[in-house]
């Protein structure tokens, strides 16, 4: 019995109780079409909620996007970069056009590579357009098996600094992909002592370390009907780290924390809100514990925006240690939450600057990370200036 049938039955029985027995039949029902099952990928509900929609053509203040991917390795295997050569996702002219429209003072290309690839990227962007682009270097994992790798990698950081690198980027390769034989064998832990000289070199040269460890907590749980990011993982099954020999999210975060504790003179930017935007209490505890820790918000406004009250308090308390970043990738249409275009930046501005309610966190028909919407946190001008520009400028020494 469906709800409509139950209501008809309840009314009929009530009448029978009041007036005695009756032979009257229940009112005839109109033919009601039953919804047909559909594939979840076809489901694109449109909200009927009538709320204010702010139009955000530019950020209120100039900004530095601390987290973008303008280039990537030309050769990789099993998640590990194996060659210094780079492939580029956008020309300086293409990027600058968007930057001018959106009030972006500078972009940081965190995946600038190493050796000749780094030198080429710095020349192509940083030196050709001073003050608009800043490039980070990356570890040369292809030499990891060499006996003197710790020394070689520390020297590579010094050379990268000489070549113009403004920081070091650690992809989740370390902890989730790099193995003792580079692409095979036991996983190498984030706090492996062989990397200590590299962390120290960054501290001595005042190069910030942009470190990505772990991933959304849903990626470490079964991809089943209870997983709120089921569609995302179904589309990208290789993003799941549940099972196998992968460490847990807690183990990865703990290993990163041990690195920060061992190297207090090195500044670490724990990307993606410390890779734990689902638990701002945990991120807050780590920020309180490690004065050399910062965070960016790249690709996590979907998490921050569904807890607006908690997020606003988080920004207010840690306003000097939060960096604006998007994880933007030119021509990366497969991942709408990080595609480099005007619309992406407008959503970030709306989240940070307004009190708008229930809006999309990515320019996509179907929310790419989970089926929810977000709310703006309306930060003060003082905090916006720091998050948009001041905090990144201080770390980059510009």
Q: What is each PLM-predicted segment?
A:
Residues 64-68, 107-109, 135-137, 168, ...:
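Hydrophobic faces of well-ordered beta-strands that scaffold small-molecule active sites
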Residues 67, 99, 202, 295, ...:
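Conserved, mostly hydrophobic/aromatic
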Residues 5-25:
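N-terminal export signals
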Residues 56-57, 96-101, 120-132, 156-164, ...:
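Acidic (Asp/Glu)-rich catalytic clusters
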Residues 6-7, 26-128, 391:
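An N-terminally biased module of ancient metal coordination in phosphate/nucleic-acid-related enzymes
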Residues 34-47, 89, 244, 249-258, ...:
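H/E-rich (His + Asp/Glu) clusters that bind or coordinate divalent metals
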Residues 35-47, 118-239:
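Active-site gating/metal-coordination segments in enzymes
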Residues 72-75, 84-90, 110-119, 142-151, ...:
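Acidic-and-aromatic substrate-binding clefts and catalytic sites of carbohydrate-active enzymes
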């Amino acid at each position: 019995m469906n709800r409509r049938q139950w209501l008809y039955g309840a009314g009929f029985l009530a009448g029978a109780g009041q007036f005695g027995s009756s032979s009257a039949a229940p009112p005839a029902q109109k033919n009601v079409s039953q919804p047909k099952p559909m594939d979840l990928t076809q489901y694109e509900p449109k909200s009927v909620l009538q709320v204010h929609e702010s139009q955000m053509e530019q950020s209120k203040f100039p900004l530095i996007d601390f987290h973008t991917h303008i280039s990537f390795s030309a050769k990789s295997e099993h998640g590990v970069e194996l060659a210094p050569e780079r492939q580029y996702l956008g020309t300086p002219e293409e990027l600058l056009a968007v930057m001018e429209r959106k009030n972006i003072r500078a972009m940081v290309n965190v995946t600038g590579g190493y050796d000749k690839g780094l030198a080429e990227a710095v020349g192509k962007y940083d030196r050709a357009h001073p003050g608009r682009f800043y490039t980070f270097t990356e570890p040369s994992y292809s030499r990891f098996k060499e006996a003197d790798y710790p020394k070689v990698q520390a020297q590579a950081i010094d050379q990268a600094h000489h070549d113009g690198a403004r920081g070091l980027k650690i992809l989740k390769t370390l902890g989730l992909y790099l193995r003792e034989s580079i692409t095979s064998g036991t996983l190498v832990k984030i706090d492996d002592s062989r990397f200590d000289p590299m962390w120290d070199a960054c501290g001595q040269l005042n190069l910030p370390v942009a470190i990505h460890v772990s991933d959304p907590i849903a990626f470490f749980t079964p991809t089943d009907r209870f997983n709120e990011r089921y569609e995302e993982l179904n589309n990208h099954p290789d993003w799941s780290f549940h099972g196998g020999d992968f460490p847990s999210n807690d183990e990865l975060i703990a290993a990163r924390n041990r690195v920060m504790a061992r190297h207090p003179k090195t500044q670490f930017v724990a990307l993606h809100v410390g890779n734990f935007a689902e638990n701002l209490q945990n991120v807050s505890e780590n920020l309180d514990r490690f004065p050399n820790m910062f965070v960016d918000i790249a690709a996590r406004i979907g998490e921050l925006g569904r807890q607006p009250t908690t997020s606003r308090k988080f920004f207010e308390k840690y306003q000097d240690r939060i960096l604006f970043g998007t994880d933007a990738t030119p021509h990366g249409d497969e991942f709408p939450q990080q595609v480099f275009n005007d619309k992406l930046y407008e959503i970030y501005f709306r989240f940070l600057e307004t009190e708008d309610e229930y809006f999309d966190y990515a320019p996509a028909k179907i929310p790419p990370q989970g089926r929810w919407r977000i709310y703006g946190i309306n930060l003060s001008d003082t905090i916006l200036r720091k998050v948009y520009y001041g905090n990144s400028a201080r770390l980059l020494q510009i």
